[in-house]
Amino acid sequence: MSTSKRKIDHLKICLEEEVESGYTGLEDVMLIHKALPEVDYWKIDTEIEFFGKKLSFPLLIASMTGGHPETKEINARLGEAVEEAGIGMGVGSQRAAIEDESLADSFTVVREKAPNAFVYANIGMPQVIERGVEIVDRAVEMIDADAVAIHLNYLQEAIQPEGDLNAEKGLEVLEEVCRSVKVPVIAKETGAGISREVAVMLKRAGVSAIDVGGKGGTTFSGVEVYRVNDEVSKSVGIDFWDWGLPTAFSIVDCRGILPVIATGGLRSGLDVAKSIAIGAELGSAALPFLRAAVESAEKVREEIEYFRRGLKTAMFLTGCKNVEELKGLKVFVSGRLKEWIDFRG
């Protein structure tokens, strides 16, 4: 099956099937309500700077799609809304457009619609191992990217019938990429989370930030369950549907090692606020914006505003004048997340 066909299959499955794994760990985080906030809601400053780009509030639309003619309009709507809102976004894996240059416009449309926004390129670690720095450079140049995400999607590859399963010398190759590429490198999981031990390895390799891509949002093991035809592969995919570290577990594990992007089941501005309070620099989500973009750019704008309003409300009700104060907020942690923190010391 061509990479392009696989991409549109993934997109349709995400839109039409139940592909979320549920528990993110953010359910175990409570922001402590301040009955007298002593701040003016209208003066709250949500702006941050990320890799030299100002964002109106700490949100990225996560890597999602591209690489098929049907995805061009989706990326155009996302880019348009991101530019207007003053936030950032990532494109989906650019492998298909590198293999077939006729598909490049499904990605380049993002930069056309968002000339000033923070936009990051995206390519898979299996392809980087196979082809080296050259493929990363091409991904960056294709969209004039401000950064590049190298996605670590080995759970998906293990379930996928045509999966790339060689991870040998991955760290060595990643070190070479970080030395050579002219933009910051983000190491990005795609639904199974990143542990402290791996975060330390990634820092030593020269990675600039981590997108934890934790469990709790879209499960690509689940996505592959809907694609595979043989019963053994389907059964294995079901077994690993809930595999990985929940998003909040990864955030607390990786904080302080590298800047953390919180992705994996964030569905509101409150989720973004909780993520920042426990150690993330900013939040990110894909599925809510994908569903909105299928309808219109206006729906994407509404979803962005929903996240922005929720974040600002959480900041107001906890007495935070800016995002730095949110980072220093004391929170109540319970349940499995508390057990994880105790276990990890």
Curated annotation (Swiss-Prot):
Any GO BP annotation: isoprenoid biosynthetic process
E.C. designation(s): 5.3.3.2
Binding residues for substrate: 6-7, 93-95, 156
Needed cofactors: FMN; NADPH; Mg(2+)
Binding site for FMN: 63-65, 93, 122, 188, 218, 265-267, 286-287
Keyword RNA-binding carried by entry: no
CDD domains assigned: IDI-2_FMN (cd02811)
Subunit structure: Homooctamer. Dimer of tetramers.
Protein name (Swiss-Prot/TrEMBL): Isopentenyl-diphosphate delta-isomerase
